[in-house]
Amino acid sequence: MTLLTPTRKTLALALAATLLAAAPALSFAQAQPAPAAASMQGASPSQLVLDNTKRVLETLESRRAEFTRDRAALQKFVSGEFNTMFDRDYAARQVLGRHGRGASDADVKAFGDALADNLMRRYGSSLLDFNTQLRVRIKSESPLPRGLGVKVSSELLRSGGEPIPVDYLMRRAGSGWRVFDVMVEGVSFVQTFRQQFDSELQRKSIAQVAQELRSGRIAADASSD
């Protein structure tokens, strides 16, 4: 089993934590057709994250042998869950920061798709090292400034170890909720990659960086600070 460095482990945890919130966005969008239904028990982002944690962890555990043997099946599972709940375009604009001002929706989408696909290729297999015996405890749900959405603060509880703090930043997308940033132990998914790609984006266009991510010439890298 590969030993993850602290930074790489943090990203693997962020990906795993993101998967834990995957099904809620879809189930909420499908199961809550009327605005009034949003007040129903279990409709909050916190409850949706909590309710679906068990299913995702059980899937990773029950299919571990299959995923170890068939990495294509793992990638399909990871990509499917990730695509369901992660607001790629909004997250991409956050990662681009000042470089995204005035950028076309098409360029932002291309960058977001390339970044997500690169992450899945590089770090998806790290989920095979993930401790599926973890439990999740929701600590709080609080509104983000300027009505941007909500922050769901949680902890991953592990036997014999300190709880791992995980915060989800979520926003309304259509009739459901989607995650646009995950913070594990205070490390932000968005901030990590905003810093990493800043120098590239100073020298190249968004389309060029997206193409190089897609081709593998540059990579979303969490192996060093």
PLM regions: where:
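Solvent-exposed loop/turn segments at secondary-structure junctions
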Residues: 100, 117-118, 143-144, 157-158, ...
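Bacterial N-terminal signal peptides that target proteins for export
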Residues: 2-15, 25
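Surface-exposed, charged secondary-structure patches
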Residues: 111-113, 121-164, 216-225
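Early exported N-terminus immediately downstream of N-terminal targeting peptides
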Residues: 38-123
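C-terminal segment of classical bacterial N-terminal signal peptides
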Residues: 18-29
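Short beta-strand edge/turn micro-motifs at domain boundaries
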Residues: 163-191
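Low-complexity, intrinsically disordered terminal/linker segments enriched in charged
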Residues: 181-225
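Compositionally biased, proline/threonine/alanine/serine-rich low-complexity intrinsically disordered stretches
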Residues: 28-54, 58, 208-211, 215-225
